[in-house]
Amino acid sequence: MLAARLIILLSFYWLSASAIDPADPLFVDLPHGKIRGRDNGFYYSYESLPYAEPPVGELRFEAPQPYKQQWTDTFDATQPPVTCMQWNQFIFGDNKLAGVEDCLTVSIYKPKNTSQSSFPVVAHMHGGAFMFGEARQNGHENMMREGKLILVKISYRLGPLGFASTGDAGLSGNFGLKDQRLALLWIKQNIASFGGEPENIIVVGHSAGGASVHLQMLREDFAQVAKAGISFGGNAMDPWVIHRSARGRTFELGRIVGCGQASDSMELKNCLKSKPAGEIVSAVHSFLVFAYVPFAPFGPVVESPDAPEAFISQHPVDIIKSGKFAQVPWAVTYNTEDGGYNAAVLLEKQASSGRELIFDLNDHWFDWAPYLLFYRDSMTTIKDMDDYSRKLRQEYLGDRRFSVESYWDLQRLFTDVLYKNATELALDLYRKHGKSPVYAFVYDNPANTGIGQFFAKRTDVHFGTVHGDEYFLIFENLARGPEMRSDEEIISRNFLNMINDFVLSGNGTMTFGNCVLQDNVGSNKLQLLSITKNGCENLQLESFP
């Protein structure tokens, strides 16, 4: 079904070419009608363009349907994209519900660069653990100032609305991933109308956005919608990506919102369709052990082979081993202290006690660690789980207690288990089973302020190079300070040039500054580019440092 839809959608592409009015580039003709964008000084924006029918009512918990409406009046594309409904950890107070259910849009940003008649295209997947976040959480002014690329930001369903699954054909799941897929089809079909080059599309994302890029690339037909992908700080191997116990969690969701009488998946889905969306999303609170842990109670699943329009029906490891995935260039990254994203929240002083949560780990390690590190559902018995918890603590902390002084080793544990080990695993699989180039880099250059300080609400701790420190040099984010150091300005420009050159490369080569990244496919050793404030260096490794 998805392949047939692709053929139908792409057949409209030629109708949309050269649709910008040369007399007024704010107006663009699309198959649905005319739109009006905004002049932002050094770039144009065309925001909140629907790519799917609203996923409400009978379309809730279903694969997205292509947008069908025709506009009789000019569509106002000057409004920023709305937030997809979510339980957002960044909202203070007890009620963290935000957003709306009707949110499936793309937003397009085009630089004013008269020296280019057309532009390569970056399709952007935002992060947020598949639970929260939004298209506008990352800025675009750095990319627009460079003037070389068109940027398209994708909004997709999140949390239970995007990823509830009973593991069978009745309520298959992965609706957020299917949204992303349909958005990529829309971009391929329509981007020429904005001066974009449909033959030069690269998909990038960070964290869950990076994992989304990888999951999209595990479909063999990805090559029909994009030329390459970059997964920053997240990939499909990460333990928080593929969920193993979605069925029980989804039936529990039903019980919480008053659908406990449902005896099968279809009955549960029909009942959930009748409930207010806000009630369903607010139920996320009931799945949290403390604070926002686990940070991803709902997420991607391996669908049943008989599921309608299944996105993936094998585990990512098995897909890669089979060789049946898109053979297009891919890059994957991690930061030296990525785990600070998850660990730093434990350093915030609690209003009730005046001390940090990290001290509570001494009494609750065996209860909390499986949720913090996402192995609760992968262990067969409680004993297996406790043994693994004990092993991790001994390996990283020895006999020391959890405290502010031992934070560095705790974040190292989080970095390894949640990010670094999975990146190494992905590279190892691709070098054995891949055919197109696969690259990797590690970033080690702490921001003055970043996610570590943001979550811990303190600056007296050295957090290192935390999750997002590299990505926010490309796409601005409020979690870090707005100013860049001189070394970060150079790195930012190198990243932007890297993306531009990667998508335009005829043979999939990738460069950063004066360094040429080395291909892992077929290599006897892991090829990893190290990026620091002092430059870049190619490393050949038996295993990651």
From Swiss-Prot:
It catalyses: a carboxylic ester + H2O = an alcohol + a carboxylate + H(+). It is an enzyme of class 3 (hydrolase). It comes from the Eukaryota. The active site is at S207, H467. It holds the Pfam family COesterase. Residues 1-19 form the signal peptide. Its EC number is 3.1.1.1. InterPro entries: AB_hydrolase_fold, CarbesteraseB, Carboxylesterase_B_AS, Carboxylesterase_B_CS. Glycans are attached at N113, N421, N507. GO terms for cellular component: extracellular region. SUPFAM superfamilies: alpha/beta-Hydrolases. Coiled coil: none annotated. Disulfide bonds join C84-C103, C259-C271, C515-C536. One of its GO terms (molecular function) is carboxylesterase activity. Keywords: Disulfide bond, Glycoprotein, Hydrolase, Secreted, Serine esterase, Signal. It is found in: Secreted. Belongs to the type-B carboxylesterase/lipase family. PANTHER family: CARBOXYLIC ESTER HYDROLASE. This is Esterase-5C. The gene is Est-5C.
